[in-house]
Design a protein with these regions (language model features):
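Sec-dependent N-terminal signal peptides
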Residues: 4-14
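C-terminal motif of bacterial Sec signal peptides marking the signal peptidase cleavage site
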Residues: 16-20
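A Zn2+-metalloprotease active-site environment signal
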Residues: 2-4, 21-252
């Protein structure tokens, strides 16, 4: 994901372009700018609270596999040897019953895996991908992504400053927009590499097979034609597979 730092500048540019056309609520614009600035300094508790709301909204919008479903039973078995606290948060794992190939994790430990991904991965590959998502939480990448998503939502306050009602709380629609912004953000290549290494190290520490990381990335690379949504936030899978193979070879 690419960490966007230009939200405030973009908002102020919009304000400048529209100021000559209509009467603006300056106080509202100041509030919008303040919200964008504050977004990048949200406390851990605030990010977790936003993630809690966003995760609940995502769960409400998707068909979640039941406790007794084959998908949930398999997922819980796969993650059992990986489970640990992530930045003080207890991870919770659920499956979305959709054929989309995707997985993501939020700063509150909300980790969601799509059935389409599970169908294409064996257990070792699935652990590698999930370990990667856990890495984004532990290393603070998911926190930064939520801060960025929230900061970009400040653009709505610019519209409010032109005369629309001011949004004081996130309703279902706004939570949906926040969740979409979070999922559509992109981590940097360095963040992706760090999460790959986190997964490799976690698997090694737990004495689990690491070769699945390589084959998982190879499968994702083969899906680069558009079938895999996970590819939009996980670029360069072929190169990453090669790097993981180099780590495996070096450890022999």
């Amino acid at each position: 994901m690419t960490f966007r730092m230009g939200a405030l500048a973009a908002m102020l540019a919009v304000a400048g372009l529209t100021a000559g056309c209509q009467t603006m609520d300056v106080g509202g614009l100041v509030g919008a700018g303040s919200k964008a600035v504050q977004a990048f300094s949200l406390s851990d508790q605030e990010v977790v609270a936003l993630s809690d709301q966003s995760c609940k909204q995502m769960d409400a919008e998707h068909k979640v596999a039941s406790t007794n479903s084959k998908y949930n039973k398999r997922l819980q078995r796969v993650v059992k040897p990986l489970t640990k606290q992530l930045n003080g948060q207890t991870p919770n794992f659920k499956v979305y019953q959709t054929q989309e190939v995707n997985a993501w994790a939020m700063a509150n430990g909300c980790i969601r895996v799509y059935a389409g991904l599970m169908d294409k991965m064996n257990d070792d590959e699935l652990r590698g991908v999930i370990g990667h998502e856990m890495g984004h939480v532990e290393l603070g990448h998911s926190k930064k992504a939520m801060q960025t998503a929230y900061g970009l939502s400040a653009a709505r306050d610019v519209a409010a400053a032109t005369g629309n009602s001011v949004v004081t709380q996130l309703n279902s629609s706004q939570l949906g927009e926040l969740s979409e912004a979070f999922l559509n953000a992109q981590f940097s290549q360095s963040q992706e590499s760090a999460a790959d290494d986190y997964s490799f190290d976690l698997l090694t520490e737990r004495k689990l097979k690491t070769q699945g990381l390589v084959s998982a990335f190879e499968k994702l690379a083969a899906l680069d034609g558009g079938e895999s949504s996970v590819m939009s936030s996980h670029p360069g899978s072929k190169e990453r597979a090669q790097r993981m193979q180099q780590r495996i070879d070096a450890a022999k």
